């Protein structure tokens, strides 16, 4: 667990509380699950700081994804941790979660409000102004602008960098969050009006992400 990142997130949350009018109660720090880097999402969720975090459940293509989503949803309700399911509004509704859109696009199962309850959270990723506009049209409560910096999930992929991230975040108005390469040692380079961040390795136990990243690298090498 990156305690510098957690401390920064607590400061962001304190600023959010002082806003006038107060912002909707949206977590400022989000764990993004990943079948390779977070093989045990329930253990990762159990370790999250309380009253600060949300969870974006991905685990795309994982065997038993629906059953795992149901188990994670039950755990998140017990711990009062908001949960969104990536890319599948029908599954999100079935487990009582919100939904996470990719690039602001509709989910493959026919959209959002057809399945979700009215108060359900909607988050989205965005890599460009066009993605951001789609996300806002879809009513996203939070938009993760990514990749902010080089990330271990996508080695070699081009990153926005702090300057481009800030320019895109200004277009996001009140919804912009950072995702990709987010760690405590860099997060204070983000503008003070950053609304929060998403992370994988920084929210896992010390050393756990290194092991999972090596396993993921071997997996990718064997399947390329």
Over which residues does each language-model region extend?
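Charged helix-capping and loop-helix junction motifs
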Residues: 69-70, 157-166
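Catalytic cores of alpha/beta
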Residues: 44, 83-98, 127-139, 165-199, ...
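N-terminal ligand-binding/catalytic initiation module
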Residues: 21-26, 48, 203-206
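Short secondary-structure boundary/capping elements
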Residues: 36-40, 127, 160
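Glycine-rich phosphate-binding active-site loops on the catalytic face of alpha/beta enzymes
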Residues: 31, 103-114, 142-156, 184-224
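A short, Lys/Arg-enriched amphipathic alpha-helix followed by its capping loop at the start of a domain
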Residues: 43-53
